[in-house]
Amino acid sequence: MTPRPPANLLHRVLLLLAALCGTLSAQINVELQFPRSTYLVDEPALATLRITNMAGRDIVLGEKTQNGPWCQIQVQAVHGSSPTPRQNSPSFPPLFIRAGETVSRSVNVLDIYDIPSPGQYRVRANIVMESVRDPYVTAPAYFTTDPGKVIWSTTVGVPEEKSAGDSPRTYSVITLKRREGVFLYAKLEARQDGWRFPPYQLGRMLSAMPPQSQTDRENNLYVFHAAEDDLYTLTQIDVATGRSGQAVYRSKTPKGGRPRMERLPDGRLAISGGIRITDEEMKPPAAADRAKLSDRPQGF
Protein backbone atom coordinates (compact mmCIF):
# COMPACT_ATOMS: atom_id res chain seq x y z
CA MET A 1 0.00 0.00 0.00
CA THR A 2 1.37 3.44 -1.00
CA PRO A 3 1.93 5.66 2.03
CA ARG A 4 -0.04 8.91 2.09
CA PRO A 5 1.74 12.21 2.73
CA PRO A 6 1.04 13.81 6.07
CA ALA A 7 -2.09 15.96 6.11
CA ASN A 8 -0.17 19.07 7.11
CA LEU A 9 2.28 18.62 4.17
CA LEU A 10 -0.60 18.25 1.70
CA HIS A 11 -2.19 21.37 3.16
CA ARG A 12 1.03 23.34 2.67
CA VAL A 13 1.36 22.21 -0.96
CA LEU A 14 -2.21 23.30 -1.71
CA LEU A 15 -1.58 26.68 -0.08
CA LEU A 16 1.58 27.12 -2.15
CA LEU A 17 -0.25 26.29 -5.39
CA ALA A 18 -3.05 28.67 -4.50
CA ALA A 19 -0.54 31.41 -3.79
CA LEU A 20 1.19 30.84 -7.13
CA CYS A 21 -2.11 30.91 -9.01
CA GLY A 22 -3.13 34.04 -7.16
CA THR A 23 0.16 35.71 -8.09
CA LEU A 24 -0.36 34.91 -11.75
CA SER A 25 -3.98 36.07 -11.81
CA ALA A 26 -3.17 39.31 -10.01
CA GLN A 27 -0.15 40.39 -12.08
CA ILE A 28 -1.96 43.34 -13.62
CA ASN A 29 -5.24 45.16 -13.18
CA VAL A 30 -6.85 46.68 -16.29
CA GLU A 31 -9.71 49.16 -16.74
CA LEU A 32 -11.34 50.67 -19.83
CA GLN A 33 -13.47 53.82 -19.57
CA PHE A 34 -15.08 56.38 -21.87
CA PRO A 35 -15.22 60.00 -20.63
CA ARG A 36 -18.78 60.32 -21.93
CA SER A 37 -21.52 58.06 -23.18
CA THR A 38 -22.65 59.68 -26.46
CA TYR A 39 -20.70 60.55 -29.61
CA LEU A 40 -21.70 61.84 -33.02
CA VAL A 41 -21.44 59.23 -35.79
CA ASP A 42 -17.84 59.31 -37.12
CA GLU A 43 -16.62 61.33 -34.12
CA PRO A 44 -13.47 59.82 -32.55
CA ALA A 45 -14.53 57.70 -29.55
CA LEU A 46 -11.55 57.97 -27.22
CA ALA A 47 -11.38 55.49 -24.35
CA THR A 48 -8.81 55.46 -21.56
CA LEU A 49 -7.03 52.17 -20.89
CA ARG A 50 -5.45 51.98 -17.41
CA ILE A 51 -3.02 49.20 -16.51
CA THR A 52 -1.69 48.69 -12.97
CA ASN A 53 1.36 46.47 -12.49
CA MET A 54 0.74 44.29 -9.42
CA ALA A 55 3.35 41.63 -10.22
CA GLY A 56 5.92 42.94 -7.75
CA ARG A 57 8.44 43.41 -10.57
CA ASP A 58 8.84 45.46 -13.73
CA ILE A 59 7.02 44.07 -16.78
CA VAL A 60 7.05 44.70 -20.52
CA LEU A 61 3.96 44.22 -22.63
CA GLY A 62 5.37 43.29 -26.03
CA GLU A 63 4.15 44.46 -29.42
CA LYS A 64 3.11 40.94 -30.45
CA THR A 65 2.68 37.61 -28.65
CA GLN A 66 1.92 34.10 -29.85
CA ASN A 67 -1.78 34.94 -29.38
CA GLY A 68 -1.62 38.23 -31.29
CA PRO A 69 -0.99 41.83 -30.20
CA TRP A 70 -0.62 42.41 -26.46
CA CYS A 71 -3.67 44.72 -26.52
CA GLN A 72 -6.77 43.55 -28.37
CA ILE A 73 -9.94 45.66 -28.52
CA GLN A 74 -13.30 43.93 -29.01
CA VAL A 75 -16.38 45.92 -30.06
CA GLN A 76 -19.86 44.40 -30.22
CA ALA A 77 -23.18 46.02 -31.06
CA VAL A 78 -25.70 45.74 -28.23
CA HIS A 79 -28.41 45.35 -30.89
CA GLY A 80 -27.94 44.30 -34.50
CA SER A 81 -24.78 43.46 -36.42
CA SER A 82 -21.41 44.11 -34.82
CA PRO A 83 -18.91 46.41 -36.58
CA THR A 84 -16.05 45.17 -38.74
CA PRO A 85 -12.40 45.52 -37.66
CA ARG A 86 -10.28 47.72 -39.92
CA GLN A 87 -7.59 45.99 -41.97
CA ASN A 88 -4.75 48.42 -41.26
CA SER A 89 -5.52 49.56 -37.72
CA PRO A 90 -2.62 51.07 -35.75
CA SER A 91 -0.57 48.71 -33.59
CA PHE A 92 0.15 49.12 -29.89
CA PRO A 93 3.86 49.74 -29.24
CA PRO A 94 5.60 47.83 -26.42
CA LEU A 95 4.79 49.18 -22.97
CA PHE A 96 7.19 49.14 -19.99
CA ILE A 97 5.50 49.33 -16.57
CA ARG A 98 7.42 49.55 -13.31
CA ALA A 99 6.34 47.55 -10.28
CA GLY A 100 3.31 49.19 -8.64
CA GLU A 101 2.96 51.75 -11.44
CA THR A 102 -0.30 52.64 -13.22
CA VAL A 103 -0.08 53.81 -16.83
CA SER A 104 -2.84 55.18 -19.06
CA ARG A 105 -3.20 55.05 -22.82
CA SER A 106 -5.84 56.62 -25.07
CA VAL A 107 -7.53 54.29 -27.55
CA ASN A 108 -9.62 55.62 -30.43
CA VAL A 109 -12.09 52.82 -31.09
CA LEU A 110 -12.81 54.20 -34.58
CA ASP A 111 -9.17 53.66 -35.54
CA ILE A 112 -9.68 49.94 -34.92
CA TYR A 113 -13.29 49.38 -36.04
CA ASP A 114 -15.43 50.84 -38.80
CA ILE A 115 -18.58 52.09 -37.02
CA PRO A 116 -20.67 54.00 -39.60
CA SER A 117 -24.09 53.26 -38.08
CA PRO A 118 -25.75 54.80 -35.01
CA GLY A 119 -26.29 52.48 -32.06
CA GLN A 120 -24.97 51.35 -28.68
CA TYR A 121 -21.72 49.42 -28.52
CA ARG A 122 -19.99 47.25 -25.91
CA VAL A 123 -16.20 47.46 -25.73
CA ARG A 124 -13.66 45.26 -23.94
CA ALA A 125 -9.87 45.24 -23.91
CA ASN A 126 -7.91 41.98 -23.76
CA ILE A 127 -4.35 42.25 -22.44
CA VAL A 128 -2.17 39.29 -23.44
CA MET A 129 1.03 38.32 -21.57
CA GLU A 130 3.40 35.55 -22.62
CA SER A 131 3.82 34.39 -19.01
CA VAL A 132 0.07 34.02 -18.39
CA ARG A 133 -2.14 31.52 -20.20
CA ASP A 134 -5.41 33.49 -20.21
CA PRO A 135 -5.68 37.16 -21.22
CA TYR A 136 -6.73 39.87 -18.79
CA VAL A 137 -10.17 41.10 -19.85
CA THR A 138 -11.62 44.44 -18.78
CA ALA A 139 -15.17 44.94 -17.64
CA PRO A 140 -17.33 46.10 -20.57
CA ALA A 141 -17.47 49.82 -21.34
CA TYR A 142 -20.37 51.23 -23.35
CA PHE A 143 -20.79 54.15 -25.74
CA THR A 144 -23.51 55.29 -28.12
CA THR A 145 -23.18 56.88 -31.57
CA ASP A 146 -25.94 59.29 -32.61
CA PRO A 147 -26.54 60.95 -36.01
CA GLY A 148 -27.57 64.21 -34.33
CA LYS A 149 -29.84 66.77 -36.01
CA VAL A 150 -28.75 68.62 -39.16
CA ILE A 151 -29.78 72.28 -38.80
CA TRP A 152 -27.95 73.72 -41.83
CA SER A 153 -26.29 72.32 -44.94
CA THR A 154 -24.91 73.60 -48.24
CA THR A 155 -22.82 72.31 -51.14
CA VAL A 156 -20.10 74.51 -52.66
CA GLY A 157 -17.28 74.32 -55.16
CA VAL A 158 -13.56 74.60 -54.45
CA PRO A 159 -11.79 77.68 -55.90
CA GLU A 160 -9.32 76.86 -58.67
CA GLU A 161 -6.39 78.46 -56.86
CA LYS A 162 -6.76 75.96 -54.00
CA SER A 163 -6.09 72.97 -56.31
CA ALA A 164 -8.14 70.47 -54.33
CA GLY A 165 -9.88 68.77 -57.24
CA ASP A 166 -13.15 69.49 -59.01
CA SER A 167 -15.40 67.57 -56.64
CA PRO A 168 -17.86 69.80 -54.72
CA ARG A 169 -17.82 69.94 -50.94
CA THR A 170 -20.80 69.63 -48.60
CA TYR A 171 -20.91 71.38 -45.23
CA SER A 172 -23.34 70.32 -42.51
CA VAL A 173 -23.96 71.95 -39.12
CA ILE A 174 -25.37 69.50 -36.57
CA THR A 175 -26.64 69.60 -32.99
CA LEU A 176 -26.19 66.67 -30.62
CA LYS A 177 -27.90 66.27 -27.25
CA ARG A 178 -25.66 64.80 -24.59
CA ARG A 179 -26.02 64.46 -20.83
CA GLU A 180 -23.85 67.55 -20.42
CA GLY A 181 -26.06 69.70 -22.67
CA VAL A 182 -26.47 70.50 -26.38
CA PHE A 183 -23.29 70.53 -28.48
CA LEU A 184 -22.65 71.91 -31.94
CA TYR A 185 -20.74 70.08 -34.68
CA ALA A 186 -19.78 70.66 -38.30
CA LYS A 187 -18.99 68.20 -41.09
CA LEU A 188 -17.08 68.59 -44.36
CA GLU A 189 -17.31 65.89 -47.01
CA ALA A 190 -16.94 65.22 -50.73
CA ARG A 191 -19.88 62.95 -51.37
CA GLN A 192 -19.05 62.27 -55.02
CA ASP A 193 -15.61 60.98 -54.06
CA GLY A 194 -16.91 59.14 -50.98
CA TRP A 195 -14.64 60.74 -48.36
CA ARG A 196 -15.22 62.92 -45.34
CA PHE A 197 -13.27 64.57 -42.55
CA PRO A 198 -13.99 63.53 -38.94
CA PRO A 199 -16.68 65.77 -37.40
CA TYR A 200 -15.56 69.07 -35.90
CA GLN A 201 -16.83 69.63 -32.35
CA LEU A 202 -17.53 73.37 -32.11
CA GLY A 203 -18.47 73.32 -28.43
CA ARG A 204 -21.47 73.62 -26.16
CA MET A 205 -24.26 75.90 -27.42
CA LEU A 206 -27.09 77.87 -25.89
CA SER A 207 -30.45 77.19 -27.52
CA ALA A 208 -31.55 80.81 -26.88
CA MET A 209 -29.44 81.96 -29.85
CA PRO A 210 -29.60 79.79 -32.99
CA PRO A 211 -26.17 79.37 -34.62
CA GLN A 212 -25.33 81.42 -37.71
CA SER A 213 -23.69 79.54 -40.59
CA GLN A 214 -22.34 81.18 -43.76
CA THR A 215 -19.63 80.70 -46.38
CA ASP A 216 -17.24 83.48 -47.36
CA ARG A 217 -16.09 84.51 -50.84
CA GLU A 218 -13.68 81.53 -51.02
CA ASN A 219 -16.40 79.11 -49.83
CA ASN A 220 -14.82 78.57 -46.42
CA LEU A 221 -17.35 77.88 -43.67
CA TYR A 222 -17.95 80.22 -40.71
CA VAL A 223 -20.20 79.27 -37.78
CA PHE A 224 -21.00 81.77 -35.00
CA HIS A 225 -22.78 80.51 -31.89
CA ALA A 226 -23.41 81.39 -28.24
CA ALA A 227 -21.40 79.15 -25.91
CA GLU A 228 -22.35 80.92 -22.66
CA ASP A 229 -24.44 83.94 -21.60
CA ASP A 230 -21.94 86.48 -23.01
CA LEU A 231 -19.42 84.22 -24.69
CA TYR A 232 -19.60 83.55 -28.42
CA THR A 233 -17.47 81.25 -30.56
CA LEU A 234 -16.59 81.80 -34.22
CA THR A 235 -15.36 78.70 -36.07
CA GLN A 236 -13.76 78.73 -39.53
CA ILE A 237 -13.20 75.61 -41.70
CA ASP A 238 -11.15 75.69 -44.91
CA VAL A 239 -13.03 74.22 -47.86
CA ALA A 240 -9.97 72.58 -49.43
CA THR A 241 -7.74 71.45 -46.56
CA GLY A 242 -10.29 71.01 -43.78
CA ARG A 243 -8.13 73.03 -41.40
CA SER A 244 -10.09 74.80 -38.71
CA GLY A 245 -9.67 77.57 -36.16
CA GLN A 246 -11.73 79.33 -33.51
CA ALA A 247 -12.01 82.79 -31.95
CA VAL A 248 -14.03 83.90 -28.93
CA TYR A 249 -16.11 87.10 -28.68
CA ARG A 250 -18.18 89.02 -26.14
CA SER A 251 -20.66 91.89 -26.47
CA LYS A 252 -19.20 95.38 -26.92
CA THR A 253 -21.33 96.75 -24.09
CA PRO A 254 -23.44 95.04 -21.38
CA LYS A 255 -26.64 96.44 -22.93
CA GLY A 256 -25.50 96.42 -26.52
CA GLY A 257 -27.34 93.23 -27.45
CA ARG A 258 -25.93 90.02 -28.83
CA PRO A 259 -23.17 90.21 -31.45
CA ARG A 260 -23.98 88.81 -34.88
CA MET A 261 -22.18 87.65 -38.01
CA GLU A 262 -22.97 89.86 -41.01
CA ARG A 263 -21.97 89.94 -44.66
CA LEU A 264 -20.41 93.20 -45.82
CA PRO A 265 -21.22 94.74 -49.24
CA ASP A 266 -17.93 93.38 -50.68
CA GLY A 267 -18.87 89.82 -49.63
CA ARG A 268 -16.59 89.58 -46.60
CA LEU A 269 -17.95 88.35 -43.25
CA ALA A 270 -17.63 90.36 -40.04
CA ILE A 271 -18.81 90.19 -36.42
CA SER A 272 -21.06 93.14 -35.62
CA GLY A 273 -21.49 94.28 -32.01
CA GLY A 274 -18.79 92.00 -30.63
CA ILE A 275 -15.23 92.29 -29.33
CA ARG A 276 -12.73 89.50 -29.79
CA ILE A 277 -11.36 88.12 -26.52
CA THR A 278 -7.60 87.54 -26.39
CA ASP A 279 -5.96 84.39 -25.07
CA GLU A 280 -4.75 86.34 -22.02
CA GLU A 281 -8.31 87.35 -21.14
CA MET A 282 -9.44 83.71 -21.39
CA LYS A 283 -6.93 82.55 -18.77
CA PRO A 284 -8.44 81.97 -15.29
CA PRO A 285 -7.26 84.42 -12.61
CA ALA A 286 -4.35 83.26 -10.49
CA ALA A 287 -5.40 81.83 -7.13
CA ALA A 288 -4.49 83.93 -4.12
CA ASP A 289 -1.87 82.53 -1.74
CA ARG A 290 -3.47 80.83 1.23
CA ALA A 291 -2.29 81.73 4.72
CA LYS A 292 -0.33 79.04 6.55
CA LEU A 293 -1.67 77.68 9.81
CA SER A 294 1.55 78.87 11.44
CA ASP A 295 0.95 82.50 10.38
CA ARG A 296 -0.14 84.67 13.31
CA PRO A 297 -3.15 86.94 12.68
CA GLN A 298 -2.37 90.65 12.70
CA GLY A 299 -2.49 92.12 16.21
CA PHE A 300 -1.51 88.89 17.99
Stretches found by the model and what they are:
Residues 11-23:
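Bacterial N-terminal signal peptides
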